[in-house]
C-alpha cells in the first residue's frame, strides 16, 4: 500500500491509495461519514482494472480532515479487534 496526498487544504483532503480497492474504500468512507465534523466522505476507483482508490474528505472546520481520517482508521482497528475476539470466543 502506498498513500499519496493529491490535495490538502484546511477542510479538505484528497488521497490516492495504491494497492487497495472497494473493500477498503467502502470501509473508510463509511466510517468517516459517522464522525462528527465530517461533511462529506467518499472514494472512487479511477479504473476497474487498477488497484487504486481516491479518498475525498471534507470537514466543517471543527476537525481537520487528517484527524478525521486517523479517527476513522482507529475506529476500524478497534472494530476489527472486537470481531477477532468474538470469533476466537466461538471456538471455545
From Swiss-Prot:
It is an enzyme of class 2 (transferase). Keywords: Cytoplasm, DNA-directed RNA polymerase, Nucleotidyltransferase, Transcription, Transferase. Its EC number is 2.7.7.6. Signal peptide: none annotated. It comes from the Archaea. It catalyses: RNA(n) + a ribonucleoside 5'-triphosphate = RNA(n+1) + diphosphate. GO terms for biological process: DNA-templated transcription. InterPro entries: RBP11-like (IPR036603), RBP11-like_dimer (IPR009025), RNA_pol_Rpb11_13-16kDa_CS (IPR008193), Rpo11-like (IPR022905). GO terms for molecular function: DNA binding; DNA-directed RNA polymerase activity; protein dimerization activity. Disulfide bonds: none annotated. It is found in: Cytoplasm. The keyword Cytoplasm applies. GO terms for cellular component: cytoplasm; DNA-directed RNA polymerase complex. Part of the RNA polymerase complex. Belongs to the archaeal Rpo11/eukaryotic RPB11/RPC19 RNA polymerase subunit family. DNA-dependent RNA polymerase (RNAP) catalyzes the transcription of DNA into RNA using the four ribonucleoside triphosphates as substrates. PANTHER family: DNA-DIRECTED RNA POLYMERASE I,II,III, DNA-DIRECTED RNA POLYMERASES I AND III SUBUNIT RPAC2. This is DNA-directed RNA polymerase subunit Rpo11. It comes from Saccharolobus islandicus (strain L.S.2.15 / Lassen #1).
